[in-house]
Amino acid sequence: TLNNAASSLDVLLTNMILEEEDKVIFPEGEYTLPMTLPLDKSITLQGAGQSQTIVNGHISVNSPSGGSVALTVSDMTLKGTDNSSAHGLIGMIGTGKDIVKLTNCKLDGGAVTAQTAAVGVRMESVGAELSLTNTDIDVNYYGIGLRNKEQVLDITGGTFTAWGAIMTSAGSMSPSDGTLANTNTRITAKDATFISRTLLNGKSNSYGAVILQEKYNGVTADFTNCELRAVDGLDPLINATQA
């Protein structure tokens, strides 16, 4: 494994080939990805703490057909920078098995507000698995978007603040009208807080803390010791210029 500090992300991404199961350690500090980090191999990213290591940028997990890619991240903040990103801060977009595990992390949307960019994690691939432990998400659109069938979302602890903290959508499915009788998707959350952020022009554009859309059927959701909270009125982050 690498097991060394990623002192220059430009060097890391342009001159070094990441191998399967490599581990990249980020010491305390702030770093900026020069482009969206594309992953077709399983790697681990380790920081020095949620508030100590800040990585600006976006990551896409893109497993090959018949294969799997696991992204394991701990002890850092990933902050959005690209308003044109099509897959959120972390996109799970492969044709194989995409797995993401976040521990003691934060996904911070920052100033990113575009609909596809200002999402914590977009789960777009069939069978995607996302696990979050003591991880916070604070973004301007969807915290976590489940967008395909046979997906698994497991949450333990953390605070999730977004226009929709958890949102299911048929957007990535193959039926032309987006309808699927049974997605066989499972959502499990315990000891977590989900907060709905008002978007655009005040109360009329509030959405919800957890949204299970009507065309995305057959979801099993189990919430234990969780708080779902709606925020009434204008959101100061998004609506400062419109208020």
Which residues does each PLM region occupy?
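Predominantly polar beta-repeat domains that present long G/T/S/D/N-rich surfaces used to bind, process
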Residues: 196-197, 202-243
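Short, polar loop/linker segments at the starts of domains and inter-domain junctions
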Residues: 1-9
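Structural detector of coil-to-beta-strand junctions
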Residues: 58-60, 70, 85-91, 117-122, ...
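N-terminal extracellular ligand-recognition/capping segment immediately after the signal peptide
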Residues: 10, 20-44, 49-58, 78, ...
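All-beta strand scaffolds that present successive hydrophobic residues in beta-strands
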Residues: 44-47, 71-75, 99-104, 129-134, ...
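A structural signal for beta-strand register positions
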Residues: 30, 49, 77, 106, ...
